[in-house]
Amino acid sequence: MQTQSLNQTSYVFRTENLNVYYGSNLAVKNVTLDIPARQITAFIGPSGCGKSTILRCFNRTNDLIPGARVEGKLTYHGKDLYAKEVDPVAVRRRIGMVFQKPNPFPKSIYDNVAYGPRVLGMKVDLDEVVETSLKRAALWDEVKDKLKENGQSLSGGQQQRLCIARALAVQPDVILMDEPCSALDPISTRRIEELMKELVQDYTIIIVTHNLQQAGRVSDMTAFFSVELVGSNRVGELIEFDRTEVIFNSPTKQATRDYVEGRFG
């Protein structure tokens, strides 16, 4: 596993020897990396290497999985994300997540976006929040005349942008994306990628993707994870983390080169 200190001035997350267990089974081991602010970081690697597991550590959604536990150090703006006094719900407000399959609520488009601010009791103008969030998610022009329609009636690409708008409505600092385009057609995928490039001006974005071309197109930084057999268990580990152009053009690890050149994984 390679640990690199990258010359960035501001980090949102820093991990040190991070291990994730499911029950007694080690799922990912010894992950040490720094996630820079206002950049897009891509996690790539074969299935089962721990990309999504590590992503879920950043907003503590692993807490929702029975038997899951995290060891090691993970800080968010310099503060221990797993300290006893930290409220996981507050963490998830600041660190939003967009999942692989679009998952709009069975509510109107308006109520999907307004849901978070309502639940959190945010003292905001909901009409303004809904409009602003939908505009930021590049969806407003397509839905502004049908806000009362069910969000699940939208196309797959529109539903995913609605989920992004829903995440933006609670004013997050970070957006996590777990394979956000895997269920979408190429045109919808391109729109999501264009949207990411716009959003990174104001948000830190981390994306898990199996699509190497996508990682190369959208990300500033790339972390390559792989799998090691430990006894009968498959354990994920971070192999290399660097600027995306380095990972794809001149990686220092042979395993990284083999993966990005299509010889493995």
Curated annotation (Swiss-Prot):
Its EC number is 7.3.2.1. Residues 13-260 form the ABC transporter domain. SMART domains: AAA. Keywords: ATP-binding, Cell inner membrane, Cell membrane, Membrane, Nucleotide-binding, Phosphate transport, Translocase, Transport. It is a peripheral membrane protein. It is found in: Cell inner membrane. ATP binds at residues 45-52. GO terms for biological process: phosphate ion transmembrane transport. One of its GO terms (cellular component) is plasma membrane. It catalyses: phosphate(out) + ATP + H2O = ADP + 2 phosphate(in) + H(+). GO terms for molecular function: ATP binding; ATP hydrolysis activity; ATPase-coupled phosphate ion transmembrane transporter activity. Pfam families: ABC_tran. It comes from the Bacteria. The complex is composed of two ATP-binding proteins (PstB), two transmembrane proteins (PstC and PstA) and a solute-binding protein (PstS). Part of the ABC transporter complex PstSACB involved in phosphate import. Responsible for energy coupling to the transport system. Belongs to the ABC transporter superfamily. Phosphate importer (TC 3.A.1.7) family. This is Phosphate import ATP-binding protein PstB 2. The gene is pstB2.
